[in-house]
Amino acid sequence: MKFSQSLIALAACFLPLIAAAPVEAQHAKIRSPRAQDIIPDSYIVVFNKGVNDADIESEFSSVSRILSKRRSAHKGVGHKYNITGFKGYQIETDTGSIGEIAASPLVAWIEMDGKVQANALETRSGATWGLGRISHKATGSNSYIYDGSAGSGSTVYVLDTGIYIEHSEFEGRAKWGANYISGSPDTDENGHGTHCAGTIAGATYGVASKANLVAVKVLDRDGFGATSATIAGINFVGQNGKDGKSVISMSLRGHYSAAVNSAVESTVSNGVTIVVAAGNDGDDASNYSPASAKNAITVGSVDSTDTRASSSNYGSVVDIFAPGVNVKSASIGGKSAFSIKSGTSMATPHVAGLAAYLIGLGGLSSPAAIASKIASIGTKGSVKDPKGSVNLIAYNGNGA
């Protein structure tokens, strides 16, 4: 399964990388995805599928010897990824060392690490139409019709700028999970993650108002991070999430990355539903990750007239559309503060919340079943200008 004042808003922009020519020349395993920024001397090393723990430990010993031999001043091995079907690590080192590491028979490929950037989003006072839209087949309703289970028993992991967990919208149901931004406090200093979390499970503006929320911080106060940190966040959920009861919401995007897609696809295969933004580039979403990950649920944005937002990415990898223009939700301005934001970043949490809502109803035990249900009950044929995308708007199956 298959985004400035920039383009109205995405949460973030993966900008993976252009490899330096000397590195490419040293080994064909080193990949250089499309990019506009790079993190110098930082790499994501992916092991072959099926590699065992003993071989991995032996490999780390070998890497230590390589770094020691070259007397590298870099930090060395950082994040380690241990998802069934996706194992690897992030390393800071020089080009000579990475060439030696790439030569290992245990290494499938290496990607240069990339920056992640969160764009500023527009805010203003406005209406609350998104919940009305996903609980009715037609536009125009501001009432939200839903089952009282409201996502009870589900947990949504928000990979973003963090969550202001003290906000009244969360009623104590939000907690801190992990922080992959070095030196950053365990709170949301930006506001993007809190807004997304409010749409997912806020008491007033949330789709699944009884679901639990876990903050996984992969973007800093200025909206910057690294591809490697985002994969570390996915790995955290893979290690801590409960199969069939967990959802990842990723309102971020970047140019196509095999490492990001592989981590997403492996985590879904292990029982975690992953909902991702199509992106705000007005472009084919297949050019971006994690939007192009095969078994993620990829979400485009529509406005209150069911017209695809002009900035919303589109195409065959988009699985569904959801409200993403002028969406009201929680903000970091205070425990009762709210703001209005727009973008596929805002559409994505509507569908992540819907996945949690369906888990709360019971009877759906796998990501495939949840995705199938979302597709089968969605409002068909209402999207204006889908531009080659599926013509489907998220719907919870309740209102007329």
UniProtKB/Swiss-Prot annotation:
<feature type="domain" description="Peptidase S8">
    <location>
        <begin position="128"/>
        <end position="400"/>
    </location>
</feature>
<dbReference type="InterPro" id="IPR037045">
    <property type="entry name" value="S8pro/Inhibitor_I9_sf"/>
</dbReference>
<dbReference type="Pfam" id="PF05922">
    <property type="entry name" value="Inhibitor_I9"/>
</dbReference>
<protein>
    <recommendedName>
        <fullName>Subtilisin-like protease 1</fullName>
        <ecNumber>3.4.21.-</ecNumber>
    </recommendedName>
</protein>
<dbReference type="GO" id="GO:0006508">
    <property type="term" value="P:proteolysis"/>
</dbReference>
<dbReference type="Pfam" id="PF00082">
    <property type="entry name" value="Peptidase_S8"/>
</dbReference>
<dbReference type="InterPro" id="IPR034193">
    <property type="entry name" value="PCSK9_ProteinaseK-like"/>
</dbReference>
<keyword id="KW-0645">Protease</keyword>
<keyword id="KW-0325">Glycoprotein</keyword>
<comment type="similarity">
    <text>Belongs to the peptidase S8 family.</text>
</comment>
<feature type="active site" description="Charge relay system">
    <location>
        <position position="160"/>
    </location>
</feature>
<dbReference type="InterPro" id="IPR010259">
    <property type="entry name" value="S8pro/Inhibitor_I9"/>
</dbReference>
<dbReference type="InterPro" id="IPR023828">
    <property type="entry name" value="Peptidase_S8_Ser-AS"/>
</dbReference>
<dbReference type="InterPro" id="IPR050131">
    <property type="entry name" value="Peptidase_S8_subtilisin-like"/>
</dbReference>
<keyword id="KW-0964">Secreted</keyword>
<dbReference type="GO" id="GO:0004252">
    <property type="term" value="F:serine-type endopeptidase activity"/>
</dbReference>
<keyword id="KW-0378">Hydrolase</keyword>
<feature type="site" description="Cleavage; by autocatalysis">
    <location>
        <begin position="119"/>
        <end position="120"/>
    </location>
</feature>
<feature type="glycosylation site" description="N-linked (GlcNAc...) asparagine">
    <location>
        <position position="82"/>
    </location>
</feature>
<feature type="active site" description="Charge relay system">
    <location>
        <position position="345"/>
    </location>
</feature>
<comment type="function">
    <text>Major secreted subtilisin-like serine endopeptidase. Mediates the degradation of collagen, the major structural protein in the mammalian host. Degrades the nonhelical regions of collagen that function in the cross-linking of the helical components. May function as virulence factor involved in epidermal wing necrosis observed in white nose syndrome (WNS) in bats.</text>
</comment>
<dbReference type="InterPro" id="IPR022398">
    <property type="entry name" value="Peptidase_S8_His-AS"/>
</dbReference>
<dbReference type="InterPro" id="IPR036852">
    <property type="entry name" value="Peptidase_S8/S53_dom_sf"/>
</dbReference>
<feature type="signal peptide">
    <location>
        <begin position="1"/>
        <end position="20"/>
    </location>
</feature>
<dbReference type="InterPro" id="IPR015500">
    <property type="entry name" value="Peptidase_S8_subtilisin-rel"/>
</dbReference>
<feature type="propeptide">
    <location>
        <begin position="21"/>
        <end position="119"/>
    </location>
</feature>
<feature type="active site" description="Charge relay system">
    <location>
        <position position="192"/>
    </location>
</feature>
<keyword id="KW-0732">Signal</keyword>
<keyword id="KW-0720">Serine protease</keyword>
<dbReference type="GO" id="GO:0005576">
    <property type="term" value="C:extracellular region"/>
</dbReference>
<dbReference type="InterPro" id="IPR023827">
    <property type="entry name" value="Peptidase_S8_Asp-AS"/>
</dbReference>
<dbReference type="InterPro" id="IPR000209">
    <property type="entry name" value="Peptidase_S8/S53_dom"/>
</dbReference>
<feature type="domain" description="Inhibitor I9">
    <location>
        <begin position="42"/>
        <end position="117"/>
    </location>
</feature>
